[in-house]
């Protein structure tokens, strides 16, 4: 279920402050955040935000088509190593 339209999109205040502070500077550095729940705003376009996946911060370059989505959608938290191999083929007959 999506968020109610009357509430509007959510973004953590500390993340918004970091993005606004970057807008004043000439050099764009990576913005580190733990806020996977924040919605991507149009003002985030062109910035690189390092989103925490539970182990490390994964850099995500924000593009125009990402606006409206959550930051956590672009950084998977689980590593899939594949299903178990079938040892019947390699066994001795």
Curated annotation (Swiss-Prot):
Main function: Protein S19 forms a complex with S13 that binds strongly to the 16S ribosomal RNA.
PROSITE patterns named among the record's database cross-references: RIBOSOMAL_S19
InterPro entries hit by this protein: Ribosomal_uS19, Ribosomal_uS19_bac-type, Ribosomal_uS19_CS, Ribosomal_uS19_SF
Pfam families hit by this protein: Ribosomal_S19 (PF00203)
The protein's name: Small ribosomal subunit protein uS19
GO molecular function: rRNA binding; structural constituent of ribosome
GO biological process per UniProt: ribosomal small subunit assembly; translation
GO cellular component: a single term: cytoplasm
Gene field: rpsS
UniProt keyword Ribonucleoprotein, yes or no: yes
SUPFAM superfamilies reported in the protein's UniProt record: Ribosomal protein S19
Family: Belongs to the universal ribosomal protein uS19 family.
PANTHER family per record: RIBOSOMAL PROTEIN S19P FAMILY MEMBER, SMALL RIBOSOMAL SUBUNIT PROTEIN US19M
NCBIfam families: rpsS_bact
The keyword Ribonucleoprotein is annotated on this UniProt entry: yes
Species for this entry: Ligilactobacillus salivarius (strain UCC118) (Lactobacillus salivarius)
Top-level taxon in the UniProt lineage: Bacteria
Alphabetic keyword roster: Ribonucleoprotein, Ribosomal protein, RNA-binding, rRNA-binding
